[in-house]
């Protein structure tokens, strides 16, 4: 979405200049790895896109991508128990002592589960079971086809990659990461149900208003923003959770920038900044900046750092980094590479004279060392949570389309929405309450 070229030829619909989307966040000369290229389509027509790519580039130049499922803690215990011939009930009793938490490991489970540790210490068979499971935990357990990934190659795919077939279709035997390391073009063709809802609603509206098109919506429509400010967002993409409704009521969004910011903030981590964001929105005279140079970068988000692109702009405008340098530091911050972060702190504050990495630094640009370090600390703490504004803008664009349809064409929108969830009884009941 940050590409002016993509916008100009109609690949994307969001004006990157109007919303200050930085192309270098996607691709720049100093970026080592290839960027992700994710494209959402109506989920009923995703296969048409894959068929088109096969025709365009040749079936032998296109393959879907393998993904490997690995043995999680509980599965490792169950699989090892099966091989050891231990009755299933006994193995299951051990496996169930592993807490059901995201990224739980056997080592950590032994630390936090008193009962699992007791079984491990007192039962030799359980000791052998878990010791063996520890050795296979995390190993590949099965292969499947990635839900969206497709690789397109200049020469026939088997020139670069080992292939297998799944349901008659070629599938790489290298995973996403390995394909990226080879420098090959990886595309994610994603099916998004909401785009199908928008299409179906548009077709229904066109039956009585042939000139209607979602490509011609007024993205400054006050009625739509009034509806959002009332929290009437059941069925609206990205904005229908109860918590998001409360934030919408508190914010009273006035434009798409507000929606972009909310989608970026309403996630674990950045969510803690929402009270400050709302307070600054309604009391702008109380917003203060550590240095005047920050004002035009952060004014669109009420004085808060919200986007990765803002981190890059701060590096560029306060310390003279190139966008490529700025993106590399942002990546180091997001991955908490402390050695790199400390080296770059010195460059941010005092500049760098190394060939190819020259920058004047904040002090040379009239910012005190103390203030420069405070700004760097603030960026470091938030960079791991900051969201890609280009992604958020895409989400906000689709969110507005669904909100506009609900506001101005509620019958057509709700019919399309209900049709899309016919296989989900709870959702049908929930959305029927809106009709």
Where are these regions (language model features)?
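Alpha-helical scaffold/interaction cores of sigma-54-like transcription cofactors
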Residues: 1-435
């Amino acid at each position: 979405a940050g590409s002016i070229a993509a916008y100009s030829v109609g690949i994307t619909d969001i004006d990157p200049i109007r919303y200050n989307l930085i192309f270098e966040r996607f691709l720049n000369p100093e970026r080592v790895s290839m960027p992700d290229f994710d494209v959402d389509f109506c989920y009923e027509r995703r296969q048409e896109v894959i068929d088109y790519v096969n025709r365009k580039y040749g079936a032998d130049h296109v393959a879907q991508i393998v993904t490997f499922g690995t043995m999680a803690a509980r599965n490792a215990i169950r699989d090892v128990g099966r091989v050891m011939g231990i009755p299933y009930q006994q193995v299951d009793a051990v496996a169930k002592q592993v807490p059901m938490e995201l990224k739980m490991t056997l080592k950590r489970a032994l630390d936090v589960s008193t009962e699992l540790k007791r079984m491990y210490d007192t039962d030799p068979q359980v000791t052998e079971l878990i010791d063996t499971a520890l050795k296979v935990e995390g190993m590949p357990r099965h292969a499947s086809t990635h839900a969206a990934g497709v690789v397109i190659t200049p020469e026939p795919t088997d020139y670069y990659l080992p292939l297998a077939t799944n349901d008659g279709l070629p599938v790489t035997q290298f995973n996403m990461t390995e394909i990226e390391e080879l420098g090959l073009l990886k595309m994610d063709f994603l099916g998004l149900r909401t785009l199908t809802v928008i299409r179906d609603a548009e077709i229904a509206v066109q039956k009585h208003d042939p000139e209607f098109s979602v490509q011609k919506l007024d993205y400054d429509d006050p009625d739509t923003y009034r509806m959002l400010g009332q929290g009437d967002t059941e069925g609206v993409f990205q904005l229908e959770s109860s918590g998001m409704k409360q934030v919408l009521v508190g914010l009273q969004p006035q434009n798409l920038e507000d929606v972009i910011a909310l989608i970026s903030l309403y996630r674990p981590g950045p969510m803690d900044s929402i009270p400050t964001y709302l307070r600054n929105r309604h009391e702008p005279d109380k917003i203060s900046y550590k240095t005047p140079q920050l004002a035009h970068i952060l004014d669109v988000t009420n004085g808060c750092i919200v986007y990765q692109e803002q981190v890059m702009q701060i590096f560029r405008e306060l310390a003279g980094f190139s966008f490529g340098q700025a993106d590399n530091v942002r990546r180091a911050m997001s991955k908490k590479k402390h050695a790199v972060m400390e080296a770059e702190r010195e460059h941010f504050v005092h500049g760098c004279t190394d060939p190819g990495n020259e920058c004047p630094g904040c002090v040379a640009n009239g910012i005190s060392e103390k203030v420069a370090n405070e700004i760097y600390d603030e960026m470091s703490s938030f960079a791991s949570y900051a969201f890609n504004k280009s992604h958020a803008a895409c989400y906000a664009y689709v969110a507005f389309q669904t909100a506009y349809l609900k506001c101005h064409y509620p019958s057509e929108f709700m019919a399309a929405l209900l049709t899309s969830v016919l296989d989900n009884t709870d959702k049908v009941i929930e959305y029927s309450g809106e009709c």
